[in-house]
Swiss-Prot record:
It comes from Salmonella dublin (strain CT_02021853). InterPro entries: UROD/MetE-like_sf, Uroporphyrinogen_deCO2ase_HemE, Uroporphyrinogen_deCOase. SUPFAM superfamilies: UROD/MetE-like. Homodimer. This is Uroporphyrinogen decarboxylase. Substrate binds at residues 27-31, 77, 154, 209, 327.
Amino acid sequence: MTELKNDRYLRALLRQPVDVTPVWMMRQAGRYLPEYKATRAQAGDFMSLCKNAELACEVTLQPLRRYPLDAAILFSDILTIPDAMGLGLYFEAGEGPRFTAPVTCKADVEKLPIPDPEGELGYVMNAVRTIRRELKGEVPLIGFSGSPWTLATYMVEGGSSKAFTVIKKMMYADPQALHLLLDKLAKSVTLYLNAQIKAGAQSVMIFDTWGGVLTGRDYQQFSLYYMHKIVDGLLRENDGRCVPVTLFTKGGGQWLEAMAETGCDALGLDWTTDIADARRRVGHKVALQGNMDPSMLYAPPARIEDEVATILAGFGQGEGHVFNLGHGIHQDVPPEHAGAFVEAVHRLSAQYHN
């Protein structure tokens, strides 16, 4: 494989010295970029874009042509696994993702296959291989998956949800069925991420978007337990290099200590967590990624710079920080504001590394 020219993102995840704080943005390949909209129109629809390796590669690389980002992230969707299980994923205008055949009971769970990463999900691996080739070693490639709990919420609710009553009903009335589903998903995610690593992903991230809707006890049992199983089963070295793992539970700032016990290398923080407090609590054990409010990118560049300075000062001197937003970039953010953000992180962070 090509020698990596910029490895500061991987070094920061392993709490090794870097010259400046690395930065990337969740959803950095997305609708705020006019070139993304043009490529998506060419593909026809979102899943066609995901399933075409050349176009998925093109949109992955688009933000890197605009900004000096320190990592690329695979362009895909967290719902690829449930789609490959046969739930019939489709996208409703203004409604987000929906499934034609949601999971309603234990019998439904028992029928679900564990998808073959090089079979039904082979298009994802083709995209990973294509992106790695086209990156030419400029920056590392991040692979990812949704967490078992987060995938289960979509599968049981039949799509996006605000109250999560359907899956919580299953959790409290038929926990055995939910545990069976989560166990299948944990096995599927482990296979899926390991296949991404073998195909060329140099770091992986598990997105637990909806873990924060659970009580502390339920989070441990129904979300964290299964993420821990995945971390235990992941390839942690490939191509002679360590493959770092990041866990991100949105709304999970109160559980950082338990998350750090999983053996992951880094924790993603949303914008509601104080990064100085997070570093005091778990910085001796894991790197931290985050955590500017994505809405700050609507502000004038000078205000964005102030916020970057505040977060850098909050983390303080030394290693183990990857700068990011606290969640995905919004689709109507001016692209030049994202550029001001990336530039400010690199310029203002040098003083914290010596």
